[in-house]
From Swiss-Prot:
Keywords: Bacterial flagellum, Periplasm, Signal. The basal body constitutes a major portion of the flagellar organelle and consists of four rings (L,P,S, and M) mounted on a central rod. This is Flagellar P-ring protein. Belongs to the FlgI family.
Amino acid sequence: MRLLFRFLTLVAVLAMSLADVAPAWALTSRIKDIASLQAGRDNQLIGYGLIVGLQGTGDGFRSSPFTEQSMRAMLQNLGISTQGGQSNAKNTAAVMVTANLPPFASPGSRIDVTVSSLGDATSLRGGTLVMTSLSGADGQIYAVAQGAVIVSGFQAQGQAATVTEGVTTAGRVPGGAIIERELPSRFKDSVNLVLQLRNPDFSTAIRIADIVNGYASARFGGPVAEAKDSQEVVIQKPRTADLTRLMADVENLIVETDTPAKVVINERTGTIVIGSDVRVSPVAVSYGTLTVQVTETPQIIQPEPFSRGRTAVQPQTDIAAEQTGGRVAIIDGPDLRTLVAGLNNIGVKPDGIIAILQGIKSAGALQAELVLQ
């Protein structure tokens, strides 16, 4: 646990050092890194396919009958008769195939696809995804996927034991889908550009509009940008401007960013991420744990010889209570370094830090948003 506290302290020191030494570098970004074009969003594709060539780790046809039905239908489409008994081979698996169709993608370009097992297959390693059509929300086919599946995890099993590391029932096919249909796009005919901030913030939106207006005034003779809210900035197209060139110039402008202070907590893994802008008001924290251990040690009582008695079991319960911690620490400071140092002084575990942060927030001493995952 000391390594965790040292790591948190190191992160705090680095964050404060960077803020003191190079504030301009730490707080500025290109517009393309903090905002995306509304007309340039991704579209999701989905399909159903089969993976073949597995080494006995595929679906069982009894527990996954849809896999056998799909395989028979595929073979019939290839002109192969499927009449006969049921196959017991487990080298085929039914999968869902998903992909993201990037904006302005043209036919012939390739995209990555993700495959996920539907049946009781134990591993997709070594398999090959056969030709699978990928459709959009409108039901139209936009891409066709096929190729070797790459799985990061592995599995080894014997008659009495199985060892699995990572996820073996999902994988990727890099560049496995070929785009067959492009999405209708009217980017060149648009009269404005709408930028959407990835982290909505009014201050950042206003600064983007000001930076773009400064560029437009020097280039086109007048302002063209307006911040609609904390997430959207609308840029009107000047008459003499080419929209593609305008977007290329705008996305490379440097803007000073600002985000609200947050503390992100994942209670399942015990992960705690504290932003550099977190502020803490003076607060006293006491943390202690009470451990109660109940142990059952039954005693066997034997009767005296020739007494015609019976062997009996007498229950015996031992209860031990132990209280640890209980120290009081006063956290008084304006920055992240003070918060981390105060938690280190108490010497609690990650689950205790989570409880303390929630308590500090409830007391109104944590000047940040507490995000629980």
